[in-house]
Design a protein with these regions (language model features):
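Short hydrophobic alpha-helices and adjacent helix-cap/hinge residues
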Residues: 1-139
């Protein structure tokens, strides 16, 4: 795929975050948000969303809320799916199965959520197939 991950250390300050975003923006084709309590707060969220939006750099958000606020998309899961899986495991335990034999499980149905308005702003074309397959599309 030719992907290269670039890590930019961020000094959390009024000047530190914008400087890191600017440095990334000059070399990145997209930005991936990862959970980091030291970088993300209500004070930094606006800058984190605005820089990629203004510079037409796709930002892969942390959650549905980030997509609703302007990131291009996020990968998530339908919360009913892990709930159903948990209920099925509980039934197996109640029926006497030993928990030692249960393999590690992951959500069966990952989903993605798109922000079509952001895609249009960035002049990105999203196929009808992707739009139809999305769990939610913010327009």
């Amino acid at each position: 795929m030719g992907l290269k991950i670039v890590v930019i250390p961020v000094v959390i300050s009024v000047k530190g975050l914008p400087a890191a975003l600017k440095q990334l923006g000059s070399i990145a084709d997209s930005l991936l948000g990862i959970v980091d309590k030291s970088s993300y707060s209500s004070k930094t969220a606006k800058a984190i969303l605005l820089y990629p939006f203004r510079n037409r750099i796709p930002f892969i958000g942390l959650s549905r809320a980030w997509v609703k606020s302007g990131s291009l998309y996020t990968l998530d899961w339908d919360y009913a799916d892990p709930g159903q899986q948990s209920a099925n495991l509980a039934l197996r335990i109640l029926n006497g199965e030993k928990t030692k034999i249960f393999p590690l499980q992951f959500a069966d149905k990952p989903i993605y959520i798109l922000n079509q308005k952001t895609a249009k702003h960035m002049k990105l074309e999203i196929s009808q197939e992707l739009l139809e397959g999305s769990f939610k599309v913010y327009k």
